[in-house]
Amino acid sequence: VPIFTRLMSTEEYGTYTVYLSWLQILTIMTSLYLFNGVYDNAMAKYEKQRDEYTSAMQGLTLVITGAVFALYCFTSGFWEKILNLPKSMILLMFLEALLSPALSYWSGRQRFEYRYRILVCVTILQALMNPIASLVLIRINGGTAMMRILGIVGVQVCICVPIIVFQFCKGKEFFSKEYWRTALVCWCSFSSAV
């Protein structure tokens, strides 16, 4: 959003864009982007078990994110130097990487089942709340990258936590050997094709 280039210094805006770049890489590592092609294929394959599959994929993503976070915790000093970001931003990055796949799974399911009305409402809500929350935080606490990031992560928490709870309650499946194996095999075949 162009307004943030005016409210934040060049250095702070640069830090924010570095954060976004590393977040994309972290999200690939922690979610394996299972919510893309793999998830769509499974929606067709497991037509009667979509809730269970969705919650199991969410569980797999949480386990992978937890494993990568544990690795980070043991080597945090090394990663802070490589990423050139403070620990607080890296922790927010992990929180966002933990939460955002739930929204992606939910959105993918809505699209697959042609339920666009609620998807559009949630998308518009997020599109409005992200800059508003960030603007408020930047105005109150100064034009820092941390305030911009806190605004986005705060909105992610408000939207994604209820989705995570809803999907786990509905699917009641954290681990499924069949679903996890199928997802990882599909992911391997997709990634090797790229």
Briefly describe each language-model feature range:
Residues 1-5, 28, 72, 76, ...:
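Structural signal for membrane-spanning alpha-helices in multi-pass inner-membrane proteins
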Residues 2, 105-109, 131-136, 190:
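Alpha-helical transmembrane segments of multipass membrane proteins
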Residues 3-25, 145, 181-189:
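Interfacial/gating helices of multi-pass transporter permease domains
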Residues 5-13, 26-60, 111-117:
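Transmembrane-helix boundary and interhelical linker motifs in polytopic inner-membrane proteins
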Residues 8-18, 44-56, 66-94, 140-149:
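Membrane-interface helix-capping segments at transmembrane helix termini in multi-pass transporters
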Residues 17-43, 97-103, 162, 194:
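Small-residue-rich midsections of specific transmembrane alpha-helices
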Residues 25-29, 62-70, 82-106, 120-124, ...:
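Alpha-helical transmembrane segments of multi-pass membrane proteins
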Residues 90-94, 120-169, 182-185:
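Hydrophobic alpha-helical transmembrane segments
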